[in-house]
């Protein structure tokens, strides 16, 4: 299970840094929005996947999904 602390550690990282950190910890990831544009995503809930929201190249939100 992805911890709250791990999710919080992603905030203010670049998208690339967040991807690397997720890979190092064995988690899948996806960007669900970037600079206010929401992407079409599947609605399945996965407890091993992190959803990123990106603004100006930095992760502003990270949650399990």
What are these regions (language model features)?
Residues 1-65:
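Exposed, flexible binding/inhibitory loops of compact, secreted disulfide-stabilized domains
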